[in-house]
């Protein structure tokens, strides 16, 4: 039928919207243009799918257009002759239709008296309309126009008019050419351009207080418009995923409206791939043919917690993209319904399926197939107990290009502990001179032996030798090297052993062809383990200084007091020496104390005789390097008798020409020369240790004399000297006890020595001492 338009000039209206009871809708656009035309149109529409069937009065609407949207110059408007019942948007992209009736602003009043001009404009608008309906519009602009062109039913009720009256009005206005401006067929009451959207005709009438064209039905809380485009337009939801990764929804769905007004996406059986790759403002379509393979899977229900999810609903097709290639030859593989999510090396996924949260099931509440109603589990997207990463991998170890670094703690715990130097406790570099030592101690020991340095300790020969303080005292460091068993001969012996082994290997290879020949093995191999004598050399105390001032005139009291102070320090050194003797600390602690209390005078007297023998040829008593008792000092009161007993020891050592090894063994036997009458708590072990050092004395004699008949004779002489030491020590102890008890002499005793004498006096007075002699008197 022919649509009729009644356009009458009107006065300038208030820019605000005014509702009137007149027939028709009036739109005023004169606020910006300082003029304008009031359009009063009576329209009858019966076939609009979204129109209401109830009758209501028409209301008047005044709409303001933005400033500058229409030029003030007189220009031909191709859209002014279009029927206002179309609800069609033909203006600029930013203009939105707000009512059923449409008016376009002009500078002057719009008049339809000139029929030819209006008819020509009407024909041009019809041609433009046909072209616009045939060419697909931009999804965004189409959606905006569709939403904007929807008037609210409550504010703008559906208008009814007589068809014949409308035709007569149109003929009266347009003249004879009005019949050529038919926009609809004869059986249509209105021109419906939204019939392709398949809106239900009954839906507007079910809710009388709402309009089917309300934009809030199509706009979510975040003002996201649903792209209501054609069948080939893709739909996309903007989720809360990463900024450069947007969820991709396949173009196998199109919007449909149910009776209740909800939009539904129905899966399409025939999927047509677009032939171009388009990138628009709100979404990105991957449409490269032959690159993306979309597999037909059953539709699933997936509810995601991102904005705009309610505009499409819960029904959508499962996403499965395989082999997405890029221009650089990179490949991606995604499948939400498979059990594995794999990715090639050094690739970044196009979109983010799972937000980076601990549990993926919070965003995917349910997943159910719509075809056979079978539950499809997304177990691969939810790994309990593991951290879910944004790229879909449960942990970095699942990626083929990521290798977990080895744990340093496990390597440190499982590896063998580092070997330490036996001298300074630093990390050992190997076995040097028969002992596991570091390189620094190796060089130090070699220089100390080859250079024949005479190191002296400034302290008490008990300096701490470790990695930091090993250079503080070379004397204690050298003593500790010897105590550990370092020996220059061990290196030479090792070389000899290697030479013997190589020679033996060569001879065995030459004689291996003859089975009668036997492998030549050396009869004796040098002993690499340190001997007891070598250990005794290491633990021998250093020579102590008395600190005697020779510039002051000598006196018996002064010399005796100095000797007591020196004796106290020597006793402390003797205790340390005894504890270092191999086997001594295996004895009971009480036995160790008893042996030291009985033998402390033996040790000091024998050591004094050795120093006197080595330094003064047995003519002088060398107590210390700074305190030597010569013949002049021996003439002092109470000095000669005591010095005479001590000179006997040095003279015997000089007569027998005792070697250093023999001296060390004899000194150790003097430590074990006196025991209580009741015996020791570790008596058997004591006897075994004593016999061991007696044998060591025999070995030292053999080493000095060789295999001769004089070995037994020398052994007799040395053991006879050990027995004579008991008489010498007994005389010295008697004088020491006398001076200790006689307070009138005012001779000072150090604390250590005074304690030993106090414990030893009752034992000597009671006769609770048993002398261990080698020979019977």
From Swiss-Prot:
GO CC annotations on file: centrosome; chromosome; cytoplasm; mitochondrion; nuclear speck; nucleus; spindle
NR C4-type Zn finger ranges: 421-441, 457-481
Phosphoserine: residues bearing it: 45, 113, 134, 141, 203, 211, 226, 267, 404
Region called Interaction with CRY1, residue ranges: 532-697
Post-translational events: Acetylation by CLOCK reduces its binding to glucocorticoid response elements and its transcriptional activity. Increased proteasome-mediated degradation in response to glucocorticoids.
Region (Disordered): 1-22, 130-183, 394-415
Residues found modified as Omega-N-methylarginine: 23
Comp. bias intervals (Basic and acidic residues): 1-14, 151-163
Interaction with CLOCK, as annotated region: 485-777
Entry keywords, A to Z: Acetylation, Chromatin regulator, Chromosome, Cytoplasm, Cytoskeleton, DNA-binding, Isopeptide bond, Lipid-binding, Metal-binding, Methylation, Mitochondrion, Nucleus, Phosphoprotein, Receptor, Steroid-binding, Transcription, Transcription regulation, Ubl conjugation, Zinc, Zinc-finger
GO molecular function: DNA-binding transcription factor activity; nuclear glucocorticoid receptor activity; nuclear receptor activity; sequence-specific DNA binding; steroid binding; steroid hormone binding; zinc ion binding
Location in or out of the cell: Cytoplasm; Nucleus; Mitochondrion; Cytoplasm, Cytoskeleton, Spindle
Region Hinge: start-end pairs: 487-523
Biased composition (Low complexity): 134-150, 394-414
Biased composition (Polar residues): 164-174
Known role: Receptor for glucocorticoids (GC). Has a dual mode of action: as a transcription factor that binds to glucocorticoid response elements (GRE), both for nuclear and mitochondrial DNA, and as a modulator of other transcription factors. Affects inflammatory responses, cellular proliferation and differentiation in target tissues. Involved in chromatin remodeling. Plays a role in rapid mRNA degradation by binding to the 5' UTR of target mRNAs and interacting with PNRC2 in a ligand-dependent manner which recruits the RNA helicase UPF1 and the mRNA-decapping enzyme DCP1A, leading to RNA decay.
Subunit structure: Heteromultimeric cytoplasmic complex with HSP90AA1, HSPA1A/HSPA1B, and FKBP5 or another immunophilin such as PPID, STIP1, or the immunophilin homolog PPP5C. Upon ligand binding FKBP5 dissociates from the complex and FKBP4 takes its place, thereby linking the complex to dynein and mediating transport to the nucleus, where the complex dissociates. Probably forms a complex composed of chaperones HSP90 and HSP70, co-chaperones CDC37, PPP5C, TSC1 and client protein TSC2, CDK4, AKT, RAF1 and NR3C1; this complex does not contain co-chaperones STIP1/HOP and PTGES3/p23. Directly interacts with UNC45A.
Protein name, per record: Glucocorticoid receptor
């Amino acid at each position: 039928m022919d649509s009729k338009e009644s356009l009458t000039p009107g006065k300038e209206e208030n820019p605000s919207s005014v509702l009137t009871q007149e027939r028709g809708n009036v739109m005023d656009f004169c606020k910006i243009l300082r003029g304008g035309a009031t359009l009063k149109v009576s329209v009858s529409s019966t076939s609009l799918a979204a129109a209401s069937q109830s009758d209501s009065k028409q209301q008047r609407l005044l709409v303001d257009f933005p400033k500058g949207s229409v030029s003030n110059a007189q220009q031909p408007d191709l859209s002014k002759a279009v029927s206002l019942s179309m609800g069609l948007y033909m203006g600029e992209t930013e203009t939105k239709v707000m009512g059923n009736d449409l008016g376009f602003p002009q500078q002057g009043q719009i008049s339809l008296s000139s029929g030819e001009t209006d008819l020509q404009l009407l024909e041009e608008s019809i041609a433009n309309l046909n072209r616009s309906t045939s060419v697909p519009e931009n999804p965004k602009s189409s959606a905006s126009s569709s939403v904007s062109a929807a008037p609210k039913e409550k504010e703008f009720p559906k208008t009814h008019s007589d068809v014949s009256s409308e035709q007569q009005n149109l003929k009266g206005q347009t003249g004879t050419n009005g019949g050529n401006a038919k926009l609809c067929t004869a059986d249509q009451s209105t021109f419906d351009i939204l019939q392709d959207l398949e809106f239900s005709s009954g839906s507007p009438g079910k809710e009388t207080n709402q309009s089917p064209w309300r934009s809030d039905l199509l706009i979510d809380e975040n003002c996201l418009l649903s792209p209501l485009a054609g069948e080939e337009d893709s739909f996309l939801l903007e989720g809360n995923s990463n900024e450069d990764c947007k969820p991709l929804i396949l173009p196998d769905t199109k919007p449909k409206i149910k009776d209740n007004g909800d939009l539904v996406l129905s899966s399409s059986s025939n999927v047509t791939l677009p032939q171009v790759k388009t990138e628009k403002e709100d979404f990105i379509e991957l449409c490269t043919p032959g690159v993306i393979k979309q597999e037909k899977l059953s539709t699933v229900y997936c509810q995601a917690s991102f904005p705009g999810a309610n505009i499409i609903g819960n029904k959508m097709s499962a996403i499965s993209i395989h082999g997405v290639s890029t221009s650089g030859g990179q490949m991606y593989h995604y499948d939400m319904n498979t059990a594995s999510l794999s990715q090639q090396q050094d690739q970044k996924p196009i979109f983010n399926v799972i937000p980076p949260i601990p549990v993926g099931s919070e965003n995917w509440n349910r997943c159910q197939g719509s075809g056979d109603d079978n539950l499809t589990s997304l177990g691969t997207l939810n790994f309990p107990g593991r951290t879910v990463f944004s790229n879909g991998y449960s942990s970095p170890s699942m990626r083929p290009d990521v290798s977990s670094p080895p744990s340093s703690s496990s390597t440190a715990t499982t590896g063998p502990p580092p070997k330490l130097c036996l001298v300074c406790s630093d990390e050992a570099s190997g076995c040097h001179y028969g002992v596991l030592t570091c390189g620094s101690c190796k060089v130090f020991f070699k220089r100390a032996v080859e250079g024949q340095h005479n190191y002296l300790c400034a302290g008490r020969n008990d300096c701490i030798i470790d990695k930091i303080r090993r250079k503080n005292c070379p004397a204690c460091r050298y003593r500790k090297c010897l105590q550990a068993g370092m020996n220059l001969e061990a290196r030479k012996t090792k070389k000899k052993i290697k030479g013997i082994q190589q020679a033996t290997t060569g001879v065995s290879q030459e004689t291996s062809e003859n089975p009668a020949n036997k492998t030549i093995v050396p009869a004796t191999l040098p002993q690499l383990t340190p001997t007891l004598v070598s250990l005794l050399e290491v633990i021998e105390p250093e020579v102590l200084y008395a600190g005697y001032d020779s510039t002051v005139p000598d006196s018996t009291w002064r010399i005796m007091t100095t000797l007591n102070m020196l004796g106290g320090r020597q006793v402390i050194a003797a205790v340390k020496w005894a504890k270092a003797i191999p086997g001594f600390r295996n004895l009971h602690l009480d036995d160790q104390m008893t042996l030291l209390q009985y033998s402390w005078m033996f040790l000091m007297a024998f050591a004094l005789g050795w120093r006197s023998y080595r330094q003064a040829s047995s003519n002088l008593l060398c107590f210390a390097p700074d305190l030597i008792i010569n013949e002049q000092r021996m003439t002092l009161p109470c000095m000669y008798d005591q010095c005479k007993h001590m000179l006997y020891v040095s003279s015997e050592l000089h007569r027998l020409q005792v070697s250093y090894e023999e001296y060390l063994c004899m000194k150790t036997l003097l430590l074990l020369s006196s025991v209580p009458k009741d015996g020791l708590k570790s008596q058997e072990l004591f006897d075994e240790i004593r016999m061991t050092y007696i044998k060591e004395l025999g070995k030292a004699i053999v080493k000095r004399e060789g295999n001769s008949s004089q070995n037994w004779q020398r052994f007799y002489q040395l053991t006879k000297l050990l027995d004579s030491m008991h008489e010498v020590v007994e005389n010295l102890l008697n004088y020491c006890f006398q001076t200790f008890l006689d307070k009138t002499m005012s001779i000072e005793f150090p604390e250590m020595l005074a304690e030993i004498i106090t414990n030893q006096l009752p034992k000597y007075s009671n006769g609770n001492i048993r002398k261990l002699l080698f020979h019977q008197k």
